[in-house]
């Protein structure tokens, strides 16, 4: 694991020790992640080699590795990578998961993803791509790193979150309620630290990847369930929210819930490579 650290690293380094307790291990976090796992499991098969952007504490990489998928898990936070590496070792899947530092805050027109062979697919879960103002260089880099027909699964925070509007307007916080409409606004990442975030619409994200990737489907994740900072509500009324979780899984694939949600999941497929005359 590289010791390099970019501007994104410090807030996530600070959040790393408590991230699983604050999100992954709570009821809401489990429901949201299991919804994503359904799509990861359908997109990546045992024996395939996939790339993860923004692996965090490694929960998704370990889950895929247990299913026989080999994962190159990357993150910009050395502390997150350290937690993820320990988790993979404890789960006895260290032979199927490798970890490396990849700083998405350094994305520019020259951004590249190192690879010795083409990946069978790639994914990024729970908003890692929201930390990037323009994701087109990432799309171009993934196009160069993923084989033809390979799936790319992206889970991104969108701009239209009714739960956020209702909660913050109900508490007299109009500016916070509509913060997702501001470009490059600040979001809290535990321990009082903040990062700059952008909230692309499904239409914009699809357009950013359109040159090299076909759109397969878009699904709302957290259309009826609240954002993670309201996990205490789910803990207080679990039966009520279990019903909303079922609505999430049954209606999230339909409009308007593909747009009205905390996150949306987009499945893309690498277009066939154009063969150039040799």
Q: Over which residues does each language-model region extend?
A:
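Acceptor-substrate binding/catalytic loop of class I
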Residues: 188-204
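A C-terminal cap/extension of S-adenosyl-L-methionine-dependent methyltransferases
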Residues: 203, 207, 217-274
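A short glycine-rich, Lys/Arg-flanked "PGG" loop and its adjoining helix->strand segment in the class I
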Residues: 136-148
């Amino acid at each position: 694991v590289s010791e390099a650290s970019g501007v994104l690293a410090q807030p996530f380094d600070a959040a790393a020790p408590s991230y699983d307790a604050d999100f992954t291990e709570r009821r809401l976090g489990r429901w949201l992640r299991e919804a994503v796992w359904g799509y990861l499991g359908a997109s990546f098969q045992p024996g395939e080699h996939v790339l993860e952007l923004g692996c965090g504490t490694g929960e998704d990489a370990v889950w895929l590795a247990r299913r026989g998928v080999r994962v190159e898990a990357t993150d910009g936070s050395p502390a997150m990578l350290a937690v993820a590496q320990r988790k993979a070792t404890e789960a006895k899947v260290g032979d199927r998961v490798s970890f490396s530092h990849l700083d998405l805050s350094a994305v520019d027109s020259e951004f590249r993803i190192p690879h010795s062979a083409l990946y069978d697919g790639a994914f990024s879960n729970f908003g890692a791509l929201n930390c990037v103002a323009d994701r087109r260089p990432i799309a171009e880099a993934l196009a160069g790193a993923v084989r033809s027909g390979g799936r790319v699964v992206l889970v991104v925070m969108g701009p239209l979150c009714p739960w956020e509007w209702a909660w913050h307007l109900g508490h007299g916080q109009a500016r916070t309620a509509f913060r997702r409409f501001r470009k490059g606004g600040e979001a809290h990442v535990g321990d009082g630290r903040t990062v700059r975030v952008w909230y692309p619409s499904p239409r914009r994200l699809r357009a950013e990847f359109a040159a090299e990737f076909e759109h397969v489907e878009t699904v709302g994740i957290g259309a009826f369930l609240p954002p993670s900072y309201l996990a205490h509500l789910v803990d207080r009324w679990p039966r009520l929210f279990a019903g909303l979780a079922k609505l999430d899984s049954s209606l999230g694939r339909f409009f308007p819930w593909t747009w009205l949600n905390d996150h949306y999941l987009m499945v893309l497929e690498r277009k066939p490579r154009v063969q150039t005359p040799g």
